[in-house]
Amino acid sequence: MYKVFAFLKRNTELLTHDEYRAGHVGYHCCHSRRLKGIRGYLVNIWSNASLQQQLGPLYDEITRNEPAGFLDLWDGFPQVYFDDWQSWSEAATAEPNRATAEGLAIDPDWRLDDGPYLFDVIEGTEGEFRSHHLHMEEHRILPVERGEQKATKLMQFFRRNPAIPADAFQSAVLGRYAYLNARLNGLQGYTVNFRDADQEAAMRGFFADTAWGFSAAGRAHRQAFCDLWDGAGELFFNSVADFAVARTDPELNLELSALERHLFDAVWYVEVDENVIVMPNRDPAPAFYYR
C-alpha cells in the first residue's frame, strides 16, 4: 500500500493544542475521510501527558540525542493509506456521494477550506499552510490488535547511524532489532516505517507544481525536518506502564539497548493519541463505496 505521514503544525495565533485537536478530529476529518480511494486514515495527536515523566529514569535510558523542541514542530500527523501512488495523487477528486432530490450527486459543500485556520498558514499565499507530507515504506512486524479499550500508541523516531549504509541499516532494524521488539510482553501491534529518501514523493501529483512546498523555502523547511529522523516505529500497548514493564525485562533490554547504540544516531519516543477515522483495510478494495 502507499502510506503517507503528514506532519502538521497548528495555527498558533488562533488555537491551543487541544483546540487544534478538536478542530482536526472533530471537523476536518469529516471532510478528509471522503478522499477518493482512501484505504485507511488515522490521525495522531501528541499526548498532553509527558512520556518522560511517566517513564522516569527509563526514558533517559532508552532515548538518545532527542531533538530539542521536536514537539514544537508539529501538533499532529495523519497517516493515510492508498492502493498506490496513482490513487493517492487522485485522492482530492470529488465523487458523487451525497444523496439529493436528483439522486446521488457531487457534494458542493465538500471542501477543506478550514485548513488556513486550523494549520500553520503561510503569509502571502492563498490559504496554503506548512506541512510535511512524506511517503513511508511500511513493514508490518506484528498486526495491530485494537480492542474496545483505547490503546496506548508510542512512536519511536530514529535516525540512522551514518557509519552504517542505508540498506544494511534497514536490514538490521527489520532483522534482529524488530524481532526483539516484537517479543516485548504485552505488545499489541508493531509497525516499522522508513521515510522515503525522495522527500517530495508524496507531494508530486497531490499538490500543484506551484505549491509552497516546491519552493526553495518549502524545500529547506522540509529538509530541516527530515534531517532529524529516518524512520519511525509504531508500538501499541494497553498502557505506558505496560511498555515500561516490558522494556525493563533484563534480557531484552540489554540486547535492545546495545543494538540501539549501534544502529541509531538518535532515538526517542512520543506518545500519541490515535484517532481511527477509517480503519486500514489492506484487502482488495470492494466494488462499492465504503469507509
Q: Where do the model's predicted regions map?
A:
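Macromolecular interaction modules
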Residues: 1-291
